[in-house]
């Protein structure tokens, strides 16, 4: 680790010119590093203290001028490529997380946490703060007899999928395999198997976190059950998760389904609403709406059946004879293929903006809005299929309250030209606000920064979450998330 001074033209340039050794790699005892506090004010941190932190780590500490910094600070959403943390603590063990948390708390330093770096609103990074990076902590172990899987906090969903399917087992994971397990799980965990197996949090048996006080705390139904309740949907508000233990289910890694296309219109959406009401929980049916080869909007439907293939062929047969059906077929295929199928298209570095919310019922009025805006073609939209096992748990049984949701509906811009960002973000928002009367809360993993909405999103569970925040993070050290403020 080179104890170099943090310099950032837009955040710290004004004071950087007054600090000794700025950008020079100085190791003088009196040199300082410029950083940002939790309230946004400027901090000066002694380089010697940063050096002591670096020496305490099994992993690595990167400052802006260090070789490897650019790669270490990288996050998924290219809209936040210009963010420059003062330091990246790339942890190699749980004690590294403890040391980083203690260092940040003692100095009131802004903290972000990165596992896969997939935070859509860029909460995995910051300007001038400390990024605590868990990406090198990704060991995964399966106990096939107990039907459980243990994963380090920096594990990616692909690590979990691969380990579980090797034993013909599975737990619910998401739709892009390079997503971090930590943020995915703590926010709820919506995926292709959730209708049959439940959300990720419904399969979470235990978690270990490092709290704001630097304590290592395990939470389960039997240990710290209040914290365990909050971790299941409360996001990263209470600490940094360094380990998860999940329940596994028997699973055939060869599933049934395929990709089908349909003429996009009101009739298709009414058909989709009917499919939701009638399909067994083994079926996961997720349409997206965008331009076809002729430029007209079509529905592209991803179908996954996690169960007996013959039963799936029979149940899904109506999808192949609908009047609006255009192309595609249903057949057995490797679950791994669909779980990794979007990894390239949704790779790192693109410009991405998304707003989403849950829908309890696809009403005629909601259908009219979707038809209007999807046909405009300015931005894409899609459904994640829910219900089934996700709805069999009481609203207050976990922090995640959205048990009545039939769908998660997303509206997204994804591209490579930053010059389009302003117009595309405006188009997403216009579509979203038109849909808002038909929505019922949002998935915190796809949240915006609206504090009022975060408060309302948890409903009757919110006061209990505030109590947990007061207990485990009274200074709101962990604030770069769907934040629950202490009170």
Residue ranges with predicted function:
Residues 2-487:
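Soluble FAD-dependent oxygen oxidases
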């Amino acid at each position: 680790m080179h104890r170099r001074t943090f310099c950032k033209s837009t955040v710290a340039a004004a004071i950087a010119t007054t600090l000794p050794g700025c950008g020079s790699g100085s190791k003088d005892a009196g040199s300082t590093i410029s950083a940002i506090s939790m309230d946004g004010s400027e901090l000066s941190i002694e380089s010697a203290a940063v050096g002591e932190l670096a020496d305490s780590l099994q992993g690595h500490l990167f400052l802006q001028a260090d070789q490897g910094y650019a790669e270490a600070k990288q996050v998924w959403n290219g809209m936040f490529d210009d963010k420059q943390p003062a330091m990246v603590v790339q942890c190699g063990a749980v004690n590294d997380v403890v040391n980083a948390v203690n260092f940040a708390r003692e100095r009131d330093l802004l903290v972000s946490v990165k596992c896969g770096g997939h935070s859509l609103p860029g909460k995995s990074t910051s300007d001038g703060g400390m990024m605590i990076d868990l990406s090198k902590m990704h060991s995964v172990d399966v106990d096939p007899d107990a039907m459980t899987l243990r994963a380090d906090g920096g594990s990616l969903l692909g690590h979990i999928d691969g380990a579980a399917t090797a034993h013909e087992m599975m737990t619910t994971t998401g739709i892009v395999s390079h997503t971090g397990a930590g943020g995915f799980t703590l926010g709820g965990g919506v995926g292709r198997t959730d209708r049959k197996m439940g959300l990720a949090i419904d399969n979470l048996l235990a978690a270990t976190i490092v709290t704001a006080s630097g304590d290592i705390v395990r939470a389960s139904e039997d240990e710290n059950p209040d914290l365990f309740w909050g971790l299941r949907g409360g996001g990263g508000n209470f600490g940094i998760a360094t380990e998860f233990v999940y329940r596994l289910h028997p699973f055939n890694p060869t599933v049934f389904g395929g990709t089908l296309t349909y003429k996009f219109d009101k009739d298709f959406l009414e058909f989709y609403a009917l499919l939701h009401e009638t399909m067994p929980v083994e079926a996961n049916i997720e349409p997206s709406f965008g331009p076809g080869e002729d430029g007209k909007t079509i529905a592209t439907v991803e179908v996954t059946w996690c169960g007996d293939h013959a039963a799936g062929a029979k149940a899904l047969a109506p999808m192949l004879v609908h009047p609006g059906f255009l192309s595609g077929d249903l057949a057995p295929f490797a679950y791994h293929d669909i779980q990794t199928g979007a990894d390239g298209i949704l790779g790192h570095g693109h410009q991405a903006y998304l707003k989403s919310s849950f829908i309890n019922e696809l009403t005629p009025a909601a259908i009219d809005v979707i038809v209007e805006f999807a046909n405009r073609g300015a931005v894409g939209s899609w459904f994640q299929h829910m219900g089934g096992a996700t709805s069999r748990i009481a609203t207050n049984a976990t922090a995640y309250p959205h048990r009545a949701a039939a769908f998660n509906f997303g509206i997204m811009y994804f591209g490579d030209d930053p010059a389009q960002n302003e117009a595309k973000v405006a188009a997403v928002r216009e579509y979203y606000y038109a849909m808002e009367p038909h929505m019922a809360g949002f998935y915190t993993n796809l949240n915006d920064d609206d504090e009022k909405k975060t408060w309302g999103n948890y409903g009757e569970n919110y006061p209990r979450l505030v109590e947990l925040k007061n207990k485990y993070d009274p200074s709101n050290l962990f604030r770069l998330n769907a934040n629950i403020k202490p009170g």
